[in-house]
Amino acid sequence: MTMMSDLSEDLVEEILCRVSITSLGAVRSTCKGWYVLSKTRVLCKAETKHQFLGFMKKNYKLCSMRFDLHGNFNEEGGEEFMNPSIKKSGNLLDQLDICKVFQCDGLLLCVTKEENTRLVVWNPYSGQIRWIKCNNSYHRYEGYAIGYNNNRKHKILRFSDMSFSTYKIYDFISNSWRVLDIAPNWHINPDQRGASLKGNTYFFAREKREDEEDEDILWQPVEYLLCFDFTTENFGQLHPLPFEQYIDDAGALSSFGEEKLAALFQSFASSVVEIWVTSMIEANAVSWIPFLKVDMKPHCSFRFRLPFDGGSFFIDEEKKVAVVIHVDVVAESEMNRYEDVAYIIGENGYVKKVCLVEAVNQGGSLNLSKRSCCNYPHVCCSSYVPSLAQINQSVEFENEREEEEAN
């Protein structure tokens, strides 16, 4: 009789590739050989080449998400895309309300809704979870990013760009925060989620004008791309975007292919969604080319309107399609009904709607203003690539956490 431990490594990898990343820990614990193998090799990288693997924040809970964008042909010769699979993370994070999530190098940085003195970093592949203590409580007007330097050492950027600009960096090795000496001549909206690329994070930015009051900054258009370098621990120069985003417009960033960025834009006065991708991205120069442009009005019962931070989207360059997450109004009444949907958009006006989940709102109309961005469904802007990145908790901090919980 063949035992699980007798299976070849290739067959084991084929088996584990069919298991969701968040369930991998439970499966590999059934066999010591599988456990050892998964600790030294990433066993499901091949899976990421054929479908989008990612994480979705829905109703303050973190869910894993699979989305097959390569599809298959039906009898009429048309191409259909498989419906996504969405599952809760199924671990400690289920007990937390997550308001923001960021992704880099196989790690997820989670900002919790209630516990505002600690951040959580999670490696879904290895199952490691690390709690990071903040020097002071955080609030919704702070932005975050996770990345790594040239030595693959991971760090976290935490910043506030309102009234008094402050920038802090957390080093995983020293387990400590440092204040950065940065005097910005630009403004980054902390509600937006940057896009991670090669260990660095890119943001949309506004240029600050001399003697400009804080409340006036938001009325200036977002028209630049700005990179934070985790090696130099500083920001680079401003690079023009292919559009100007004013206060009521929607804009978002995404990364793909390990070396490219995509930018989405929707004017407040239009139902047209435009997406550009970078044709070149270097420290001193960035250039953009159009990728897709689709009018969403014919495909929605009610107005198609993205939140001001652009919500979330991801693209498949090979298939030349984009997936845009949206909240559709199903019926307007005293008990308004909405559904979270994914719009797959392609060339020549192609649009396909995939329902993710339906919900009932008992509080009137859906608010897509700045105050509602935390509970708007978000998908991490790039496909998740598993990694063996280590985030082991230091003994000192773990003992401190146990003492806090005991009290």
Swiss-Prot record:
Domain F-box: 2-49
Protein name: Putative F-box protein At5g60560
Organism: Arabidopsis thaliana
